[in-house]
């Protein structure tokens, strides 16, 4: 049974002109336990909206979203946060306290999680933040902010972790570091979904790629099925990553690895 099911979901935003802008119109999508999924598509395709719907920050206008077979329509974000966590594109939005330690501990404290102090120590060590634990997260480097935001995101042991543009605005070395971290998440969370424009990250990391365009899923498949289909790429205006093109040229798939 899928972790999450979108059933005929529609949602619209009220524009500055006062009219409704339809983001999704009858969206159907299933997310299965244990998957590593990448959402791709042009700006405005609905990637961030889909994630906000999953964590309850937005509610569908029509249709429903099921979590483990149960409707989430009447559930609050706080109720869903034990199962699904969203790490924002801008890590600064994850920092609400004056130290990383306090930020990581906060969600556990307000929910009376047992052994929250030990869990905080564990996450600080796991994401190499122990020496930075008393620092204000907003004053860290880009890579340190990313690691801290991931630690906050997994504090409640969510079964599903959503990451919005996890490698945006990072230098090459920091980007590689975050990619290694994403690859090594199996013991922390079962299912990971990213929304990204980083096609190399998609090629190297994702098992499944969902392509969004104008509020619809226009393609859903493996790396080879998506990046090897020029019609799909043209539809959403993206180019296959160089690493995939090299693999095709050499008739080898070893360049795209998990």
What do the predicted segments below correspond to?
Residues 40-42:
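The feature captures the beta-strand-to-loop junction immediately N-terminal to the Walker
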Residues 55:
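Helix-to-loop junction immediately C-terminal to a conserved catalytic motif
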Residues 63-71, 80:
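Conserved ABC transporter NBD signature motif
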Residues 114-132:
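Conserved ABC ATPase "signature" region
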Residues 136-140:
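Conserved ABC ATPase signature
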Residues 161-164:
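Catalytic Walker B motif of ABC-type/P-loop ATPase nucleotide-binding domains
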């Amino acid at each position: 049974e899928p972790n999450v099911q979108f059933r005929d979901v529609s949602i619209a935003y009220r524009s500055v002109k006062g009219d409704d802008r339809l983001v999704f119109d009858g969206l159907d999508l299933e997310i299965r336990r244990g998957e590593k999924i990448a959402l791709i598509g042009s700006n405005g395709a609905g990637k961030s909206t889909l994630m906000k719907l999953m964590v309850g920050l937005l509610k569908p206008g029509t249709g429903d979203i099921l979590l483990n077979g149960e409707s989430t329509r009447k559930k609050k974000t706080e109720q869903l946060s034990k199962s699904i966590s969203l790490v924002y594109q801008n890590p600064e939005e994850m920092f609400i306290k004056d130290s990383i330690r306090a930020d990581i501990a906060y969600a556990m404290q307000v929910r009376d999680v047992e052994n929250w102090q030990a869990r905080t120590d564990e996450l600080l060590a796991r994401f190499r933040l122990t020496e930075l634990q008393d620092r204000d997260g907003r004053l860290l480097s880009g890579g340190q902010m990313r690691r801290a935001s991931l630690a906050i995101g997994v504090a409640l042991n969510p079964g599903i972790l959503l990451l919005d543009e996890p490698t945006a605005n990072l230098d090459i070395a920091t980007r590689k570091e975050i990619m290694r971290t994403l690859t090594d998440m199996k013991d922390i969370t079962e299912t990971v979904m990213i929304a990204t424009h980083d096609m190399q990250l998609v090629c190297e990391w994702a098992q499944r790629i969902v392509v969004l365009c104008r509020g619809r899923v226009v393609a859903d498949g493996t790396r080879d099925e998506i990046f090897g289909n020029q019609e799909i790429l043209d539809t959403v205006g993206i180019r296959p990553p160089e690493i995939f093109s090299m693999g095709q040229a050499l008739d080898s798939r070893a360049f795209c690895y998990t």
